[in-house]
Amino acid sequence: MVKQAVKVFVRTRPTATSGSGLKLGPDGQSVSVNVPKDLSAGPVNNQQEQFSFKFDGVLENVSQEAAYTTLAHEVVDSLMAGYHGTIFAYGQTGAGKTFTMSGGGTAYAHRGLIPRAIHHVFREVDMRADKMYRVHVSYLEIYNEQLYDLLGDTPGTSDALAVLEDSNSNTYVRGLTLVPVRSEEEALAQFFLGEQGRTTAGHVLNAESSRSHTVFTIHVEMRTSDAASERAVLSKLNLVDLAGSERTKKTGVTGQTLKEAQFINRSLSFLEQTVNALSRKDTYVPFRQTKLTAVLRDALGGNCKTVMVANIWAEPSHNEETLSTLRFASRVRTLTTDLALNESNDPALLLRRYERQIKELKAELAMRDTLSGKGRVSYDDLTDDELRELHATCRRFLHGEAEPEDLPADSMKRVRETFKALRAVHVAIKADMATQMATLRRATEEGSGAAARGGDSAGPSGVGDVDLRATGGFTVGHAPLDARPPVRSELGSPGAGASGAEALGEPRSPGGGLHAQASSHTDAGSNWGDAGPLSSPGGTRLAGIFGVSGDRNAVFRRYKVDVGEGRELAASLKAASIALADTKASIRSLGASVNDAKQRIDELSSALALRRGATPAGGDGEVLDSEAYALMQELKSAKSRYRTDFDSLKSAREELEPQIQAVAVARAGLLEAFDRWAAAQSDTTLKRMATAGRAMSGIAPGEEDEMDAGEQFERMQIARISERDPDSLAFHTALKRTGAAVSRPATVATGGNAKAAAMATRKMEHTQAVNRGLAR
């Protein structure tokens, strides 16, 4: 890890007042604030008037582009190199924090750090063609000490969100939506969509004051390539827009806005306490006091490259707020973070890395053996046949039938296996000796007992007695002619060779391919442009006006073009039909591929069987020539291809039925909407649309939707923007896409949560103020 100091920059809001008391040093890094003495304190007044601060830079009357170059360019470059980064704006309300981070509305030249950082990231992605990148974005809001997901499907809920730590002590928000984006336009569209869900309110100092803290995060995953995907570098950039601190006696807020100001000031106060504890190097740092400090834990003292923007409003009436902001910024500048490269700890990636390293080490061993004049040495694990042969060699060695040179010693693996085999054979021999000794003792005891009883009859085993006095020893008896010692099995019997081919999934259906099932489905989307039978009230009315079905279909065609509801439903039906057709085509293609792979497997299996039958086997087992080996490799590849195509075919079949149902539902919905519309129209309107619809009969399918005047204007506007500034095309396109979308606050207001209640309370307070004549 590398110690990295937190950089702090000051950005001033332009002001028309000349005698503001704020002076900038000639070095561009120092700031002096002159606070006049309070004359009401009396003649003895030791109040300090001059305050000086030094930072990493001061931005006064600079453009948004210059601000981005100074504040964020280096951080984004570090992000692309695999390091975490955070940029947060701090200051009083109305000082320009949101303008610095997000920008000035729809003006492209006034876009803030977030849109410019998105453009920078995707420009670097396009330039680095030798690497593979995946980019995700998330947008978090902290409102009244509650977390909200501004990009989630249900942004009104916050119960599932929680700030946690991973195994590397990095903070993350559980349950926060990560949206994958593939282009600058998609990322900007998500940002603009999240902006619509932010909570704002107006007061005397700011007409659109942010009532919450927001964190827009860009997550970047970098790999060297798809083939060599064993190393992944993960990094993220947090772009934080803090709500402004307020003096309620100046803003004059009441009711719900006052409550929000209290939460904002409380969270910023705890943030200041956390910074003070870090600057003093206390053993305990209160990161968990608020959601804001928990989210900013890495930015203040963890693995992150952090930049702070202190926004100040250099007006004489705001000297106290300016001085407070500069003091906080000077304390933040004393902090340091531990910067380290962030590599993924995914077990799958580690497995790929270890496999590659093992392969490289084996190649190096083979090269060393070749250079040292050794023969081909195998460093792989021993097979079952090799283990059985090794045990037999060790047994012969212990019985004195083999020499030490017969034991393998060409690699450490074989030496270890030899010692294991020697131990196993020794244990087995020892067990045999123990069994034989037990048998001898039992026979001796039985013989001694029979001699003591003086019996002269043969025992159950047919072994006679011998006079101990005549032999001078112990009796062992006479073994019968059919007696033999038990045969002890070897450590393992040679197994039978592999027989039969592998099971290759389901066989082909006779008379048809694997795609026969797909082709048997009814093409529910092939005739999606026909009005169908009109037996409902609207259809009955159309049948009464028009005698032939062609006129009814003509009205139906115009309904899909001229009526907004019909145009949307027809587009949905067309999209569902196209998706269904693509799935069917994919099933047919995959079915043919599976059948071809199965046929190729059968051919290769037969050829390999013939080759094995024609090649005599050696004494130690089968010896494969180059042609048989090539057939085996090709057979293995064919089986792998068969399994891949078969799994894809199975997945496509599972998607087919839901898509057929989707086409049927879309078609039924279109016909039902057309029926309702036709029942409510006049005869003149229907006849006019029938005439226009008959004129469309010569138009080819897919060419019915001609551009209207508005669409032509948009096309011309996009072309003009592309000619003037190609880099701004993504910004304007994303802004247009999200501008036509449904506003997020309306969705949030129905969520039944704290934000919805706050919006309802603020609306009620505004209504009461209007009734009392205090507002408009």
Curated annotation (Swiss-Prot):
Residues 658-776 are annotated as: Globular. It holds the Pfam family KIF9. ATP binds at G91, Q92, T93, G94, A95, G96, K97, T98. Residues 348-371, 579-657 form a coiled coil. It is found in: Cytoplasm, Cytoskeleton, Flagellum axoneme. SUPFAM superfamilies: P-loop containing nucleoside triphosphate hydrolases. Disulfide bonds: none annotated. InterPro entries: KIF6/9_C, Kinesin-like_fam, Kinesin_motor_CS, Kinesin_motor_dom, Kinesin_motor_dom_sf, P-loop_NTPase. GO terms for molecular function: ATP binding; microtubule binding; microtubule motor activity. Keywords: ATP-binding, Cell projection, Cilium, Cilium biogenesis/degradation, Coiled coil, Cytoplasm, Cytoskeleton, Flagellum, Microtubule, Motor protein, Nucleotide-binding. GO terms for cellular component: cytoplasm; microtubule; motile cilium. Its main location: cytoplasm. Residues 441-535 are annotated as: Disordered. Residues 447-460 have a biased composition (Low complexity). One of its GO terms (biological process) is microtubule-based movement. The keyword ATP-binding applies. Residues 5-335 form the Kinesin motor domain. It comes from the Eukaryota. Belongs to the TRAFAC class myosin-kinesin ATPase superfamily. Kinesin family. May play a role in rotation or twisting of the central pair microtubules of the flagella axoneme. This is Kinesin-like protein KLP1. It comes from Chlamydomonas reinhardtii (Chlamydomonas smithii).
